[in-house]
Amino acid sequence: MDLSKALSSALTCAKEEDTRDSLNNPLNLAFKGTGLSGIKTRIFLNKLLSYEEARYLEVGVFRGATFIPALFENNPKEAYAVDNWSEAGGQKELFLHHCRYFGLNKFNLIEKDFFQTSAASYSWIKFNIYFYDGHHSEESQYKALEHL
């Protein structure tokens, strides 16, 4: 799918109330109540990642309730998950379990504080889809945009 079609599909899903088909999707049922993102966010990202040239970076993957639906049945050129799970003991194992359960194995996992990674680590990749779900302070939100 080209970028304009993927974006159009994602925006349509985000605006419409018609998410019933996706509500019964086993993937969404599996994460119901376990993550902090809503179903529309998950569908929006999933539609964006249907773009055949998608290069996705998600910071703050926690249990995978956003990351896994984003990648589900998609084949992005690049996919990176960044989390150090410093505020969530035991969640890394749950994230990896969810990835295995849903057959996701084509992604890169960086287990570090995002702000402690060098932007040069990512400079060779031109990410075109970026979801930051790390620390939620206003300052962190700005830092997340500037860090890349």
What positions do the PLM features span?
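A short alpha-helical cap/connector motif
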Residues: 1-148
